[in-house]
Amino acid sequence: MAFKHGIFGSTDESGVRPMLMADTSFAVVVGTAPDADPSVFPAKKPVLIAGNPHKLAKLDMAGNKAGSLPNFMASVYDQKRCSICVIRVEEGADEAETIANIIGGVDPATGEKQGIEAILDVQAITGKRPRLLTVAGYSHKQAVLTALLPIATRLRCKVFADCPGSTYEEAVAYRQLWGDRRLELFWPRIRNKFDELVPMSAFALGVEIQKDQDPNYGYSASISNTRINGALGTEFTIDYADGDTNCLSHLLNENQITTVIMDQGLRMWGNLSCSDDPKWQFNSHVRVNDMVLDMITIGLKWARDRKILRTFVEDVVESVQNGLDGEVRAGHMYGAKAWADPDLNPPESIIAGNFYLDYDFTPPGIAQAIHVTSHFTNDYADVIFK
């Protein structure tokens, strides 16, 4: 040991770290707005709207609601004035060119990401991680959704998309094209407060954001049975009756398509994702898994490249357990447990720089079907003699 004379201080870096759930409701919307102020919404660039309706209005400087973004974003804001990111793309000479611009890609000369691909730059530009994704007015196009879903998988985001068509059969046919657990499909379109048709996904996205930011609900709750604002009705009549498995709303839900019903106001109606694995059939369960996994991976950044010592293992496990316990207390899970399995962490694996942590969890069940049974009895007839 080198010679020292005096008092020398140091800081012990061991110990449990807090785990915090980041914003679960930050959305990115890709779309067109040819009359937008280009100084505020430059084409191909992610732009943050921090709950500012005045900035949102600059998507439509001419006031004619041209493009897919103005009405779509207005319907989102009818549900919740929120921080949200918009990526404006140029309209093409025809629909095919517009769709190509929306799908985007990487400019081979500049390396600039464009269209849907630019979603990957959102966190670097805005400082906020995307959690919810959609494409205004074009999510019913198979090519667009095919490009969007891999981005959602990479970022662990939920996708809001619409079914095309004017019939139940057309909507279901589109649904059959997909088997992704992070996808929720909607049908039909909604008539907004100006009696203009707007994709249902706009209203659903706004409801999801509003629900996520309400401490009584949060990311583990379903948007189903939530009233929507700024709407006059649906493009086509969607009949609904409690207990009727043959009404259109039930048939849509049975095919994992969320709709809107009239039941003391217009309400979102449907809980299910498009997952091909029944384990992930509920949208809320997918979101709990994604949000908790993100909380843990973000919360363990301090542990990267540390020496794997006993205190390291203890601190990592306890930090994660504390984070899980916090989400349980908040009502987002029934229970959860973290552990380090010695069998997965043999000496040769640790020396090679690997450490494996496991955790389990149980998300809340969703009361999708409430069963009420009546019992006819004579037992109370003797009340006439009391």
Predicted features along the sequence, with ranges:
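A glycine- and small-residue-enriched flexible loop/hinge signal that marks low-structured segments
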Residues: 2-53, 77, 107-298, 337, ...
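N-terminal assembly/attachment segments of tailed bacteriophage virion structural proteins
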Residues: 42-91
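Catalytic cores of large soluble enzymes that bind and process phosphate-bearing ligands
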Residues: 61-65, 111-114, 140, 280, ...
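Acidic/glycine-enriched edge-of-secondary-structure segments
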Residues: 80-115
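Intrinsically disordered, low-complexity acidic/polar segments
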Residues: 95, 142, 366-370
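Acidic, low-complexity glycine/serine/threonine-rich segments
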Residues: 281-343
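C-terminal edge-of-domain segments
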Residues: 345-386
